[in-house]
Structure formats: structure tokens, C-alpha cells
Amino acid sequence: MELFLQILSGAFWIITYILIIYKSLKDKTYGMPLFALSLNLAWEFTFSFIYPPDGLVFAKIIFLTWFFLDLIILYTFFKYGYKNVKCKNIISKKSLYIFTIIIIIFSIVFMILAGNDFSVLFENDITQASGFIANIQNLIMSILFVSMLLNRGNTLGQSIAIAIFKWIGTLSVDILKFTNMLPSITTELFIIALIQFFDILYIYLIYIYSKRKCV
């Protein structure tokens, strides 16, 4: 059951990324908030290359697949992100690119430090710590997706399918925490509960916006 849910989570997130890429190219906009994308890339880079999962070949394959798909999503941000900048007389396209790279670098440094520091919560198991960190960034991501939808006032770059696959992708592996198949701490369980709230809220808002033709 544990392996099945982990593979299911990996597969649903792969589908989510592919759908984001498709919708971004179709609508000519980016479909993932910059800070969320930076954290994603940093997590995938760190736990694929710096702290790779020992003996878990399927996990390595999934992490690398996520990483390369996120690079494509980063491309869509570079391609379409600047047109969403409101004060173009203050922020140039070049400065936006530089700012983006800096955020990604800082995010990678954070992940490297956090992987080591948070491992003490899980008997120095960095692999388990990576799951805790993933839930923290998933909460940030879930909030940012809701914020992006509300700020844009439309579903460009977003879809109900993205919202649902994203939610199930996170829920699949988090079931392991609630059923004690994987170790967890109380704070993490609270974070997971918050993720479910914001993911379901995002699905509801996407449905409402789509139904009212706010595209």
C-alpha cells in the first residue's frame, strides 16, 4: 500500500505538471506562481542530486521527472511572465529574469540547509525530513495558487483538472502520514490538514470562476 500510494502521488503530480505546461502554452501565460515554482525546483534539485533517496529507484525517477517538467514550467514563466508585470517602467524583463534566478538559488540553499536541520526531527533521516519540507512548501504552494486565481480574476493558465490532480497528488502520499505508515509529527499533520483545506478551496474557486465564464 505504501509503495502504491507513493507511486500514485508521483504519477498525479507528473500529470499536474504536464497539464500546467499545456495550459500555460495554450493561454500564453504561466500556470504556477513564481515562488511556488522556485521551491519546487529547489526541492527536486536538492533531493535528486544533493540528498538522493537511498535505494529507492522509483523515487529517483519521479524526482528527476518532476525536476525536468518544472524546468519547462520555468521556461513558460520566462516566456510569458513579464507581460503580467504591472509596472514595466520600473521592472525590466532582464531584472525579472535575474530576480527569478536569485530566488531559485536562495531556495536551493534553503533546501540544502533545511534537509540537514529538519532531519533531527526524524532520527537524522533526511529522506523523511524531505517529506516534511515538501509538506511545508505544498502548503505555501496551495495558498499561492488560490492567491494567483483571486489576483488574476480568471482561470488563464489554470484548470479544474490541474486543481484536482494537484490535490490528489498531495493527498495520496499524505494518507501515509495520517495512517502512521510513514513517521510524522503533530505540526506536520496540522500542515497537511491546511493543505487539504486550501486545495479543496482552490478546486471550488476554479469551478465557480469557470462556471461564471471568468476565463
What does each model-identified segment do?
Residues 52-57, 124-125, 181-185:
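Membrane-interface helix caps and helix-loop-helix hairpins in membrane proteins
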Residues 44-51, 106-120, 170-181:
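C-terminal ends of transmembrane alpha-helices
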Residues 32-50, 63-66, 166-174:
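Hydrophobic alpha-helical transmembrane segments of multi-pass membrane proteins
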Residues 80-149:
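Membrane-proximal helix-loop-helix units in multi-pass membrane proteins
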Residues 1-13:
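Hydrophobic transmembrane alpha-helical segments in integral membrane proteins
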Residues 14-27, 44-97, 111-117, 206-210:
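Internal transmembrane alpha-helix with an interfacial aromatic "cap," most often the third helix
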Residues 25-37, 155-162:
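Membrane-interfacial loop-to-transmembrane alpha-helix junctions, especially the N-terminal start
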Residues 144-148, 158-215:
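C-terminal transmembrane-bundle signature of multipass membrane proteins
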